[in-house]
Amino acid sequence: MTTAYRSLSPEALRREYAEVSARFDALRELGLALNMARGKPGKAQLDAVSDILTILHDPVQCQADGMDVRNYGQLSGLPSAKKLFAELLGCRAEECFIGGSASLTLMYDTIAKAYTHGLLHSEAPWSRLDKVKWLCPAPGYDRHFKITESFGVEMITVPMTPTGPDMDLVETLVRDPAVKGMWCVPKYSNPDGIVYSAETVRRIAALKPAAPDFLLMWDNAYCVHEFEGPFVPFDDILTLCREAGNPDMVFEYASTSKITLPGAGISVMAASTANLAYMEKLMDIQMISYDKVNQL
């Protein structure tokens, strides 16, 4: 069907509806059970790494980093897990907080705490503000947008370009003190697979937002992946922000979901040590520790 429906007569529309309905019914009769979820590894990929399920088989192996990982404690995660993610992201181990299987949980927690308590440099919890705005490079990841939408944030669309978000527009929009943050997937951005250019990354790190608690949510989910050609690492966004005079502006997230087992991996929230100290005080009330056995 190449003709616009609005140009068809009522009779032609009825015929078209009957034809489409017949094709739809034929597909239903096939009884297909298709999982159309995007980003979900196949069984072959899961099987390739399933040996990790039997790595730990003796309680003696649960002694690591001077502690028994089966017990309570070590809210921010095992030092060895922090070191692993620091190597993957290019940041420092002390800038890493280790979470559970979903980095999305850490992202949600970050926004939630901004609303209930405010961030390190917030003048008030966001829930007390008249208006909270957020920059959403689009097209983008729907689960990111659902988080900010669920808090009633006014989301502002920023068009994507072949090199990342339209930075001229971003630099203009952040002059509004009500603009509190921006979602970013710097590598293989959903759904177009755009990779931010080095210039775009530097301009983002050098932003001068009017809001003192502007929050750059940097979802580096594909930090170790490369579709073609040699692996090209990104400059560490934490270092770039620090060098640009914005040490506390960014929270970076990643996980092993696309590396090992999505349902049983570990995640990381990387930020300045000042940011992590502030967040850990809030999270200490919420929990004692994530799954350290899995981290091991």
Predicted regions and their residues:
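Short acidic, S/G/P-rich loop/turn micro-motifs used as interaction or catalytic elements
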Residues: 42-45, 188-191, 260
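Short aromatic-enriched loop/helix-cap "lid" or pocket-rim segments at secondary-structure transitions
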Residues: 46-50, 147, 227-231, 263-266
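N-terminal "arm"/small-domain region of PLP-dependent enzymes with the aminotransferase-like
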Residues: 2-76, 80-81, 86-87
